[in-house]
Amino acid sequence: MSTKSYAERAKAHNSPVARKLLALMHEKKTNLCASLDVRTSRKLLELADTLGPHICLLKTHVDILTDFDIETTVKPLQQLAAKHNFMIFEDRKFADIGNTVKLQYSSGVYRIAEWADITNAHGVTGPGVIAGLKEAAKLASQEPRGLLMLAELSSQGSLARGDYTAGVVEMAKLDKDFVIGFIAQRDMGGRADGFDWLIMTPGVGLDDKGDGLGQQYRTVDEVVSDGTDVIIVGRGLFDKGRDPNVEGARYRKAGWEAYLRRIGETS
């Protein structure tokens, strides 16, 4: 795993998206990504505004929203991202042939490539998924975009392990600029070959151990000590009557302190 600071890594990274995110994390002193699986744009924007000061990244599943609209969902979200200095990650999990994902990413109702700084994809269909998404990103926006490959998942019984995970890592080596890292539970290596992949880990919780639907939670210290750069927290921030401002501050502090311990610094 990397023991360099986010600031050091930002200066040397190949990807403009990764450079921006790492620099933001260093400046804002947060490695927290808020995962907001809610059904209305109003709730999404309300939580984004409350959690914004605590996060480096906001993760959406816009196909859950019953009232999605570019003008009333995306544009206000972008304004909040600018206000609070966080980036946007649409958790689309693309998993089709190159031409299909190119269209899914750039077209349709959501036009994800126009507004999401980061998205992600499965490797099951082969490297064409990377090529298709990269082509769409270039056509849809003047802003740089980044891709995370799904190497491991946090759900019980996931098939994303072993040879599959190793294959996804090899696939990521085909593109040093667009592929910025992985959704994974641990460090994926690559530094010996000149890669500095960001590791983002879902299923992080300080209280719950599971949800009864296969999700398995690990602690902040566990994942960061295993190589996680960004902790992804969802329901732990706002579910079950939790105060998102209080929980955002709590997870932010826990994540940052775990990171400082990993790089040998103290708060």
Curated annotation (Swiss-Prot):
This is Orotidine 5'-phosphate decarboxylase. Pathway: Pyrimidine metabolism; UMP biosynthesis via de novo pathway; UMP from orotate: step 2/2. It comes from Eremothecium gossypii (strain ATCC 10895 / CBS 109.51 / FGSC 9923 / NRRL Y-1056). GO terms for molecular function: orotidine-5'-phosphate decarboxylase activity. The keyword Transcription regulation does not apply. It holds the Pfam family OMPdecase. It catalyses: orotidine 5'-phosphate + H(+) = UMP + CO2. It comes from the Eukaryota. Belongs to the OMP decarboxylase family. PROSITE patterns: OMPDECASE (PS00156). InterPro entries: Aldolase_TIM, OMPdecase, OMPdecase_AS, OMPdeCOase_dom, RibuloseP-bd_barrel. PANTHER family: OROTATE PHOSPHORIBOSYLTRANSFERASE, URIDINE 5'-MONOPHOSPHATE SYNTHASE.
